[in-house]
């Protein structure tokens, strides 16, 4: 497993962003783990997370000159990532959107650098159904930008349903042709748990969940 994946999963565990047990998801599935990026709730945690994002993005050779953070969780993630790249002597443009249209002041729904003519990397925590990302793609294209990739923290690698064996990430990539990179995946989480003696009791439930709901092909 790549070092940044290991760092991310340990950071998520230490921050309680990654928890093990029994969790009912929005889909109704009972998951043996739960990921909540809202628990990266300090400057140090967010900075460490941004380092993991940047390492994953660089490993994937993503081509972009602007980072876009969808409201709301994507906003601090994109901001922290832009700051991390500044530390790496790469000054990227930054934009995010608001969910409510502002009719006074600067107005509109976009805040930050203009998107027109830019190659844009979208930053978010996870992709669930992909609906929010598709809306962001529409916003970017309408503003004259070109979406060139999506980066998320965790790819759950789950099928959409028993009749649709694609994951939301696979469906999004097939539909749009836009690459999606994740810091870590369910496969990485399995390896992480297997290698960590204190987490050994969670390995079999995770494996059973992956066997039932995991995608047949890697994302």
Curated annotation (Swiss-Prot):
EC nos: 2.4.2.10
Positions annotated to bind orotate: 34-35, 128, 156
SUPFAM superfamilies: PRTase-like
GO terms of biological process kind: 'de novo' pyrimidine nucleobase biosynthetic process; 'de novo' UMP biosynthetic process; pyrimidine ribonucleoside biosynthetic process
Keyword terms, alphabetized: Glycosyltransferase, Magnesium, Pyrimidine biosynthesis, Transferase
InterPro entries noted in UniProt: OPRT, Or_phspho_trans_dom, PRibTrfase_dom, PRTase-like
Names of required cofactors: Mg(2+)
Pathway named in the protein's UniProt entry: Pyrimidine metabolism; UMP biosynthesis via de novo pathway; UMP from orotate: step 1/2
GO cellular component: cytoplasm
GO terms, molecular function: magnesium ion binding; orotate phosphoribosyltransferase activity
Entry-linked Gene3D superfamilies: 3.40.50.2020
Residues that coordinate or bind 5-phospho-alpha-D-ribose 1-diphosphate: 26, 72-73, 98-99, 102, 104, 124-132
Reaction equation(s) it catalyzes: orotidine 5'-phosphate + diphosphate = orotate + 5-phospho-alpha-D-ribose 1-diphosphate
Entry-linked Pfam families: Pribosyltran
Quaternary structure and interacting proteins, as annotated: Homodimer.
Biological function: Catalyzes the transfer of a ribosyl phosphate group from 5-phosphoribose 1-diphosphate to orotate, leading to the formation of orotidine monophosphate (OMP).
Family classification: Belongs to the purine/pyrimidine phosphoribosyltransferase family. PyrE subfamily.
Protein name: Orotate phosphoribosyltransferase
Native source species: Xylella fastidiosa (strain Temecula1 / ATCC 700964)
């Amino acid at each position: 497993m790549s070092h940044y994946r290991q760092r991310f999963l340990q950071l998520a565990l230490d921050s309680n962003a990654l928890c093990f047990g029994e969790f009912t998801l929005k889909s109704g599935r009972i998951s043996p783990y739960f990921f909540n990026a809202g628990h990266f709730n300090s400057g140090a945690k967010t900075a460490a997370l941004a380092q993991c994002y940047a390492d994953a993005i660089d490993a994937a050779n993503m081509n972009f000159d602007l980072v876009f953070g969808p409201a709301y969780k994507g906003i601090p993630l994109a901001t922290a990532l832009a700051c991390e790249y500044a530390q790496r002597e790469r000054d990227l443009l930054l934009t995010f959107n608001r969910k409510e249209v502002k009719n006074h002041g600067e107005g509109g729904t976009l805040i930050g650098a203009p998107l027109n003519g830019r190659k844009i990397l979208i930053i978010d925590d996870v992709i669930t159904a992909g609906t929010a990302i598709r809306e962001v793609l529409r916003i970017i294209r309408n503003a004259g930008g070109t979406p060139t990739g999506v980066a998320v923290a965790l790819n759950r690698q789950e099928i959409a349903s028993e009749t649709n064996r694609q994951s939301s990430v696979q469906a999004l990539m097939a539909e749009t042709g836009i690459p999606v990179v994740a810091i870590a995946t369910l496969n990485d989480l399995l390896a992480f748990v297997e290698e960590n003696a204190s987490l050994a009791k969670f390995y079999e439930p995770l494996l059973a969940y992956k066997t039932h709901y995991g995608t047949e092909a890697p994302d």
